[in-house]
Amino acid sequence: MNKMQEGDLFSFQLNNSNKYGLIQIISKQNDVYKVRVFEKVFSCLTNDEIDSIINSQDFYYLKRFYENDLIKYGKYIGNFSIPSFVSFPQYLRSSERKVNGKLVWYIFNSTTGAVVKTLNKFDKSLEKLSPNRTWGIEYIKLRWQEGFTLS
């Protein structure tokens, strides 16, 4: 994984449906990341599906600032291990709400962590970047429309 830190979050989509899950990094031990796995309330994951997801490379980075909110509404499944060689797409997107209330989107390089583009409004080009069909986009847009803030 690229530049992973404790507390970082990832989401996954199950079988191209509207079922989502959440993975949080707990620690790194040797060549393995210890993670907590949560599922969205409407998700239905079996142990086999969980193992399949954890051993795949379909993880997407989610901005850390709303981790507590996601976990609050997720159902805790258990702790698991994933290999540290799991990789991510080169370019990812994240976003944050500024102190003045403005929403800003970032495109960043997952290898270097450098922001390569900043947008003041959601642009169609962002749809092609991960996380695409994850909580990262629709969930956060909805929450911001409801007045969600960092505090």
What are the functions of these language-model segments?
Residues 28-50:
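Basic/aromatic-rich interaction segments and small domains that mediate binding to polyanionic partners
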